[in-house]
Amino acid sequence: MRLSISSSDRRFLAKLALWTAVLAVAANLATRYAMGHWDRLDRRLEMPKFDVPANLENYALNYRQCPVVVLGSSVVGGLPPPGWEKPGVCSITLVGQGSLVGLEVMSRLTQAVPRVLFVESSFGFRDASAEEIAAVTDPVRRTIRDWFPLATASANWINMLWKAQFPVATQLWHPSESWEQWHELRKPYSDIYVQIYGNPVNDWGKHHLDDNIARFKALIAEIESRGTKVILFDSPLDPRVAELPIIALWTEKMHEAFPDHEWVSDLPQKYWLVDGMHFTSGSGEDFFQLLMSHLPEGATASAAP
């Protein structure tokens, strides 16, 4: 027996579909307008709060597929750029943070033992709060996330809405642009870092950096004791950014603290950076390949048990 839909039913379904589409568009436009005109609704500044634990949670769930790890600040988000991923190599990007919080988490994930760990040095002075660490390593929270995936940071509505509504447009370098032209035109984009890190480091700040250096040494020693090879690297920052007081002082202290470790660095003039810090796609691939050239043979073959 063939089922038939009456003309009135078809009209009803058509109206229902139309109103659904209209309401969806209206809700989207209303949300965008409200977020742009009512600061309390604009949650974009909270994105790092969810992006950092989301990336750390992702590593905690998939560490067996990560015999090689690249750990660092938002700079690592371009190592490698999308589409250039290498099997067995996982990047842990900590937006608004540095390597310290990642090392704290990895030291507590005793079952996760990468063969090689690349650690970005440049922004390691950023503190690691106990709450950020517990959000990923607390066994009760981890059990809840295992049973209820919607409880993970990556499933948070702010995270999903931000990624859907505010994609980051990649600025590409064109062969007609010299490095000097690129550098000069993008100076305004690096002004924010000059404002944040441009002040001299006072005595309290120097003492605090020493505390973080000591923590770095303890965490790296613990991770190395499990059989992981740790390689440190300096991001090829624009000289204007690299010479800022706290960044320059931290870089000096890190090299003094780890003189016997393998270091990877390169001239900044080889790379095109969007804002004096973050790679364009091609430059990210170039620096990523430089890191990969320091891998021991067979490092990506399989994860350590």
Report each predicted region and the residues it spans.
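N-terminal Lys/Arg-rich, disordered targeting/topogenic segments
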Residues: 1-13
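C-terminal regions of proteins
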Residues: 251-305
